[in-house]
Design a protein with these regions (language model features):
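Active-site acidic/histidine proton-transfer and metal-coordination neighborhood
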Residues: 4-112, 119
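Short loop/turn segments at strand-loop or loop-helix junctions that form parts
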Residues: 1-5, 41-46, 164-166, 202-205
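Histidine-acidic metal/acid-base catalytic patches
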Residues: 25-29, 35-37, 60-63, 89-236
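Residue-level preference for alpha-helix termini and adjacent loops
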Residues: 2, 6-9, 175, 180
């Protein structure tokens, strides 16, 4: 879907909301013309993290947006997939709660993001002070709250997934195997999701430093060949 602060489900400005809804509908129409079945969208984090608008204000806005967009998705034969991320408004708990009232519709589901879930999962070796600088901003109320078992919680609603790796501290979008995710354990779990429609790579091919941190990619970035070979070895 269209991505960014102006296109999130929970944007508060009325004029921006009207534009967001209109363009998201158009985005679904174009995606369907290209044969897409799912349409992944973010609840939104910018206005919570940087404007510090509380969740109690933002949740109803996201709900209202889905009320408007789901009928369009039903008409097109598409599924809106709400994605888990590493900010409080996009946690697995929040996206499950947001989609709860709409689960009678065939046009709503979830997108499981492997890298986002890895950042939020606890681990014996993790240290809070090692998280990327933007994590405390994303969890400004009570600090970073780990969220374990996101896949299990979301599993029955997952219709698509974003596949990439990281070091557990930053949203680096590295190649599977270059981070801390246990792919031998994760892949069978992904494949057992009963409503999964597709698997998508979200590996960032360009190496070096970006907004999220320093990529694990080699100098010159990841090659398409390595990407294809890696995903084939994983069984995709």
């Amino acid at each position: 879907a269209l991505f960014g602060p102006k296109w999130d489900l929970n944007i508060p400005n009325p004029a921006d909301r009207e534009k967001m809804l209109r363009h998201q509908k158009k985005g679904m129409q174009i995606s369907r013309e290209f044969g897409c079945v799912t349409y992944t969208i973010h609840v939104g984090a910018y206005h919570y993290c940087y404007d510090r608008i509380p969740l109690e204000t933002l949740r109803p806005l996201a709900h209202q947006a889905l009320e408007t967009l789901i009928p369009e998705a039903e008409k097109l034969g598409m599924i809106i997939a709400v994605e888990n991320s590493f900010e409080m408004p996009n946690s697995a708990k929040e996206v499950i709660g947001l989609t709860d009232p709409f689960m009678s519709s065939p046009a709503i589901g979830l997108c499981y993001d492997t890298g986002h879930a890895n950042c939020m999962a606890s681990a014996p070796w993790k240290k809070m002070e090692e998280y990327a600088p933007y994590f405390p901003v994303c969890w400004w109320e009570n600090g970073v709250i780990p969220e374990d078992g996101a896949l299990e919680k979301m599993k029955d609603r997952i219709v698509t997934c974003h596949i990439h790796d990281n070091n557990g501290y930053a949203d680096l979008h590295d190649m599977p195997g270059d981070g801390t995710i246990d792919w031998n354990a994760l892949v069978p779990e992904l494949k057992s999701c009963p409503n999964m429609k597709e698997y998508q790579t979200e590996v960032g091919l360009v190496g070096g430093r970006n907004w999220a941190g320093v990529s694990a990619a080699p100098a010159g970035g990841y090659s398409i060949r390595r990407l294809v070979d890696t995903f084939r070895k994983l069984g995709f």
